[in-house]
Swiss-Prot record:
Example of a GO cellular component annotation carried by this entry: phycobilisome
UniProt keyword list: Antenna complex, Membrane, Photosynthesis, Phycobilisome, Thylakoid
Functional summary from the UniProt entry: Rod-core linker protein required for attachment of phycocyanin to allophycocyanin in cores of phycobilisomes. Linker polypeptides determine the state of aggregation and the location of the disk-shaped phycobiliprotein units within the phycobilisome and modulate their spectroscopic properties in order to mediate a directed and optimal energy transfer.
Coiled coil: none
Topology term for the membrane: Peripheral membrane protein
Cited InterPro entries: PBS_linker_dom (IPR001297), PBS_linker_sf (IPR038255), Phycobilisome (IPR016470)
Residue ranges constituting the PBS-linker domain according to the UniProt record: 11-191
Lineage, top ranks: Bacteria, Bacillati, Cyanobacteriota, Cyanophyceae, Nostocales
GO biological process: photosynthesis
Subcellular location: Cellular thylakoid membrane
Family: Belongs to the phycobilisome linker protein family.
Protein's name in the database: Phycobilisome rod-core linker polypeptide CpcG3
Assembly: The phycobilisome is a hemidiscoidal structure that is composed of two distinct substructures: a core complex and a number of rods radiating from the core.
Species name: Mastigocladus laminosus
Length: 254
C-alpha cells in the first residue's frame, strides 16, 4: 500500500503571483515551445532539442544520450510532448547522469526545476516527494509529477516545460548542476577530469622541450638531490663562555 503524499505549506514564488502577468508576455521568459505551433520539420526538431535542454540541462546534451525511439514517436504523433518529457526523465541516460549521483532530497529539487519549472517550496515538500521516491521508485515519482494537476495547468500535453515567470532569478540550469557537493566529496575528482588532462599535456610538453645551456631548470634534479645538514643554533648561555681563551690576544704569538 503506497503512502499518500504528505501535506506541505506553499511558499510565495513568482509563478504563483498573478500580477507578474502571462508568461508569454514576460520578456525574461525563454521562448515557449508548443506542439500547436509546429508547421515544419524544423519546428518539431526545435521542440525535441528544447525538451533535451530542459530535462538534461544544457551542459549534458550529448549525441549518445539521445532517445531516438522517443523522437520518432513524437514526430509520428504517437506520443505527446508530455509523454516525451516523461520518457526522457525515465531514460537510462538521465538515471546515470542525474539520479544515481544525487540523494533523494536534492533529486526532488532538480526534478521539480526541470519538469515543473519551479524550485521546491520548502524542506517539507522535498521530504514529501522523497517519500514517494522511496515507496514508488523514481519512475513512480516522475509519473506523479508529470501527471499532476500542476503540470497539466502549467504545460498541458503539448508544451515543453520551462522556468515559469523568471524575473531576476538565474536560470535553473546555471544554479543546479547534475550532482551536489556530497557526491563530489565521496567520489572525488576522477582522472578523466579535464584538469588532469591539461596538466599531463603541459607537463609532457615541458619535458620534451629542449632547454638551453645555463638554464637553471636543467639543475632542478641536482638541487633536489642535495641534502645539506642543518646548522642549528647551540643552546649555550653567555655566562658559560670563556672569553679569555676564546678572544685572541694581539700580544700572543703563535
Amino acid at each position: 500500500m503506497a503512502l499518500p503524499l504528505l501535506e506541505y505549506k506553499l511558499s510565495s514564488q513568482n509563478h504563483r503571483v498573478k500580477s507578474f502577468g502571462v508568461a508569454d508576455q514576460n520578456e525574461d521568459t525563454p521562448y515557449i515551445y508548443r506542439l500547436e505551433d509546429v508547421s515544419s520539420f524544423t519546428d518539431i526538431q526545435n521542440i525535441i532539442w528544447a525538451a533535451y535542454r530542459q530535462v538534461f540541462s544544457e551542459h549534458e546534451i550529448l549525441r549518445f544520450n539521445r532517445q531516438k525511439h522517443l523522437e520518432s514517436q513524437l514526430k509520428s504523433g504517437l506520443i505527446t510532448v508530455r509523454d516525451f518529457i516523461r520518457g526522457l526523465a525515465k531514460s537510462e541516460a538521465f538515471y546515470r547522469l542525474v539520479v544515481s549521483v544525487n540523494n533523494n532530497y536534492r533529486l526532488v529539487d532538480v526534478v521539480l526545476k526541470r519538469l515543473l519549472g519551479r524550485s521546491a517550496y520548502n524542506k517539507e515538500e522535498e521530504i514529501a516527494w522523497s517519500i514517494v521516491i522511496g515507496t514508488k521508485g523514481f519512475d513512480g515519482f516522475v509519473d506523479a509529477i508529470v501527471d499532476s494537476d500542476e503540470y497539466t495547468q502549467a504545460f498541458g500535453d503539448n508544451t515543453v516545460p520551462y522556468q515559469r515567470k523568471r524575473l531576476v532569478d538565474r536560470p535553473h540550469n546555471l544554479v543546479t548542476p547534475r550532482y551536489g557537493e556530497d557526491f563530489q566529496e565521496t567520489a572525488g575528482t576522477v582522472k578523466t577530469d579535464w584538469r588532469f588532462t591539461l596538466q599531463n599535456f603541459y607537463s609532457r610538453k615541458f619535458q620534451e622541450r629542449q632547454l638551453r645551456e645555463g638554464d637553471p631548470r636543467k639543475y632542478t634534479d641536482m638541487a633536489a638531490a642535495i641534502a645539506p645538514k642543518g646548522n642549528y643554533a647551540q643552546n649555550i648561555r653567555a655566562a658559560d663562555l670563556d672569553y679569555l681563551n676564546l678572544v685572541p690576544s694581539r700580544t700572543r704569538r703563535f
